Amino acid sequence: MKTYNPNEIKNIALVGSAGSGKTTLAEAMMYEGGVIPRRGSVSAKNTSSDYRPVEQEYGSSVFPAVLYTEWKDQKLNFIDTPGADDFVGGVISALNVADTAVMVVNAVKGVEVGTEIISRHVRNLNKPMIFVINQLDHEKANFEQTLEHAQASFGKKVVLVQYPVNQGLGFNQVVDVLKMEMYQWKPEGGKPDVLPIPESEKEKADELHNALIEAAAENDEGLMELYFEKGSLSEDEMRAGIRKGLIARDMFPVFCVSAEKDMCVRRFMEFLVNVAPSAAAMPGMLTKDGRLVPYEVNGPASAFVFSTTIEQHLGDINYFKVVSGTVKEGDDLINMTTGTKERIAQLYAVAGKNRTKVTELRAGDLGATVKLKGTRNGDTLNEKDCDYVFPGIKYPNSRFRTAVRAVNKGDEEKMAEVLYRMHEEDPSLLVEYSKELKQMILSGQGEFHLNTMKWRIEHNDKIQIEFYAPKIPYRETITKYAQADYRHKKQSGGAGQFGEVHMVIEPYEEGMPEPTTYKIGGVDSKMSIKGKEEYDLPWGGKLVFYNCIVGGVIEARFMPAILKGIMEKMEEGPLTGSYARDIRVCIYDGKMHPVDSNEISFMLAGRNAFSEAFKNAGPKILEPIYDVEVLVPDEDMGDVMGDLQTRRAMIMGMDADSGFQKIKAKVPLKEMQRYSTALSSITGGRATFTMNFAGYEKVPSEVQEELLKAYQETDDDE
């Protein structure tokens, strides 16, 4: 295989909703480039992309698949991404290293919520975007409506390069308004007959050709002057203008194909070769410290790892983009995250399940290596003395959580190892043992996401696991002042234990004045502050601790023990065993014994006094609240709003968004359990949502009563 330079490499992310035909398009392009001898199909479970057992089981891409083909002396690297919203992590990984996004749209379904969501990731990462309207051979294909939806969503930047003459059953003709030719295919597809545009299409083609010229000229002042001077542009001039428009995201060209019948695929590949920006035409990658590293062969060797898969007989396969210099087989590179040396023992160009050994890969290229010791997604690998470090990949917050356990208790440790390994492959899958909840918690993008993970564990690792309801990380706090005292006394023949603590507790609020007077036993008592300690609690909120002891009734050396007792009780609040927060404590009196007082005595006295005071201070349970944004088609908005209101949602607003509605709401985490599944059911899978932690709020009184009752029943059972 030839070694390619940055100006000969095109890195393309194939993105789009599930069922749009990305994998089928990738198969056709690899077949046309001669990388595979025949085209596989999703239904036959023999594509290069979806080769893993879980993908064949579900008939859907689960991981991003790195592929390539060679065409007209250039290398086209493709990353075939999952279409299901549950696997958006793979889309984001791909877009981080792609130079162009190809948005594949189903001509039957048109622009879907998935199209909208993915296009936002494309925009956020500032990638050029090309539309490919696929499945034009389907009897219900509607190119005009799909185009109309695209233009409504993305504006005048959406510009036709091609349109179908006879969409639907029997589709085999396309007019290309860049080259001003018509293509016609035989039933087997592949290479078309090139024909003059028929008279019946001439007026429409001329109009679209002129629109394309104007769009191309708008992206370059020199081309605009040429256009005004000549009244037209040559093909090469149009290509130059389209390329500039693509890179600036001022133009989204539209192509039409039938990937399944291999129609218009070759012409699309020609466009990618001639017009899509090469790695050399793109700015490069920014380091964490803001340096722009261009894709240049003469720089130091530096690579960015964007994806990892684990295969049974090979172990870890790390996929990377060469950002600078040349990576060669046998190189020793430094992992800039861990500081360890990694040997590139084997180097591959990858076409899904097919790997071709190569001796080197140059800047801008994508490749893979195996058996690295500790390299993960987002790591930078550099030659010695190179200090580039590229930012890691940012994935969206989780939207679905569950608790998980092994059916056989003896498999718990092995299950945990497998789960953490899966997180290395898919960083959007989060795994955590919660000491607070005493559960192993899995978080992901949806129920489908976690179900595919469960299938893999049970079929690949032979461990039976079960999902069950995750507990909610509630918090406890107080709403009013309370006073309590507690004497701990114990005699056992020898040295005894004695400690007495008097305290006041009250709700803590940011900026509140220092305590000066408290009403104790009906009398106003002045406080004399001898010491103050303020703690930002690991679980959120604050504890402020005052030593207001007068006359040495408790020696200062026992204050840390009292504080320790309070902190221990705050780790397991008196109401439901949840963490307590936002409390101010003042120790104002107490007693010691010259012989029997010790640290354990004051720790227990402090703990019990705090517990008693807490129960009398108007205790309340706090629940986690999330900011939720739902993107939903107009026609489903009423049903989605109604469902949110049953979930105790506070609707914060609504915005129209290109045929969709964006609903903003604050919703308790407890009510978001299985929401991704419910939303899919309500809208037929046409809506999506995001959720971000907003803070804690007091639960309604009826909810508090339910929680207290449930906790008491659990306590009684134990």
What are these regions (language model features)?
Residues M1-E718:
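Structural and coupling elements of P-loop NTPases
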